[in-house]
Amino acid sequence: MPKTLVVTNDYPPRQGGIQSFVHALACARPPDSVVVYAPAWEGAAAFDARQPFPVIRHRNSLMLPVPGVLHRAQEIVKAHGCDTVLFGAAAPLGLLAPGLRRAGIKRCVAVTHGHEAGWAMLPGARQLLRRIGDEVDVVTYLGDYFRTRLTRALSPAAAARMIRLAPGVDVTEFRPGSGGATVRERLGLAGRPLVVCVSRLVPRKGQDMLIRAWPQVRAAIGGAALLLVGGGTYRAALENLAERLRVKSSVTFAGSVPWRDLPAYYDAGDVFAMPCRTRRRGLDVEGLGIVYLEASASGLPVVAGDSGGAPDAVLRGQTGYVVDGRSAAAVAGPLIQLLSDPERAAAMGRKGRVWVEAEWRWDLVAERLAAVLSGAPPP
């Protein structure tokens, strides 16, 4: 069977959305058709031993398109009979494409995420993306926003070959009734109107705007509580903000939780909100925002920020709302609407579940990935 070599700096056990996406793409292929080449990372040996396909580790934690990395990748191609390469992130490892073709690779696919939209604004990085686009067969994109931004950096020929490839959602894991009541009981939140946010605690994600909106929400919805799930260095600043605004008693910081426990934390909420915002003059933007889709799969209405590709994960007015993540008032409005009208919130949550089941399942992503790797028209 022809094999695909996945060349990536972003791979578990290192944590992050890109790492999870690339791992899921590898797992979406038949196990005997995949080989992964990734950097060393703490805990990698134990993680790799659980995988159904070979994972070959670089000697350190970063791979660059230098002769040593190319030579090792060429050895893997020849040893495993690979004819296709999937670059887990287009830049910079996509520059290895010509050298891998010399080793026998016939098709090169480069995956993009959210950060490339910022790179496309910078002269040096834009030239790098253009070169990679010309050297691979396909550059993938998450959604329409990123396609527009990337098109400006690519040559017309490379832009014409772009294909959408976005993450999927495991609808068997993320579903209503997956343990939310237990989470509520454990955190002392049973019976309270609850807004949940699942994300790293960083400025772009907008947890600070949820806290700034919270006095207005609390004034309208008695007993409302906010549950922030995720870790990060921003936590201390958020805790201080909640104390200054005198809402600390109604804001719960759950910290980081294992992936296997996330469905229960989504299920605990009545509404999901992550009012992300674009920062650094467009260099720091949200990717697709898979958390909105996981929340929809869990039966929750969502409130998303208008950054990057986040709106692509919401059917406006049907599965949730898209708001200006820079405005506390804009964030508070839909939260109050949804918490004050449980029937409407539940209906939007049901619509979200149906939409994710129909459009965002991982088996659909697997079919699309298979077509992209083979050169067939994607479904």
Protein language model annotation of sequence segments:
Residues D134-S178, L189, T252-A254:
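Donor nucleotide-sugar binding/catalytic pocket of nucleotide-sugar-dependent glycosyltransferases
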Residues G223, S250, A330, Q337, ...:
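A short, well-ordered alpha-helix in the C-terminal region of glycosyltransferases
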Residues V7, T140, A181, L189-K205, ...:
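Conserved donor-binding/catalytic core segment of Leloir-type glycosyltransferases
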Residues E239-D261, V271:
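Nucleotide-activated donor-binding/catalytic signature segment of Leloir-type glycosyltransferases, i.e.
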Residues L315-G317, Y321-A328, Q337-E343:
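Conserved acidic donor-binding segment of nucleotide-sugar-dependent glycosyltransferases
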Residues A273, Y292, A297, P301-A304, ...:
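Short hydrophobic beta-strand element within catalytic cores of glycosyltransferases
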Residues S250, S256, D267-V285, L300:
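Acidic donor-binding loop of glycosyltransferase active sites
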Residues F87-L93:
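Short His-centered aromatic/hydrophobic patch
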